[in-house]
Amino acid sequence: MSRYVVDLGENKEFVYGFDHALGYFYELWDNSRGDEDYERLIVDKSYFINKLSKGEMIEVMEKYNARKEHLERMAMDLPF
């Protein structure tokens, strides 16, 4: 499993990665919304559970400045 965090400022984070069970996934967190995870998690999407498409994942990764090498591996359907 991989898990990468991009600090978006203002207590917000973009988290993304690859998991053998979930496939590609991403989450958006707002850490100013409370103390519990269920209060702070804004978006939670994965290939397996939410049918996250490769196109949507690439779009979101570009929007939140994910690492270029991760985008390249994603485009080739490889884990990162």
Descriptions of predicted regions:
Residues 2-29:
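Amphipathic, interaction-prone secondary-structure segments
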Residues 34-80:
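Mixed-charge, Lys/Arg-enriched low-complexity segments
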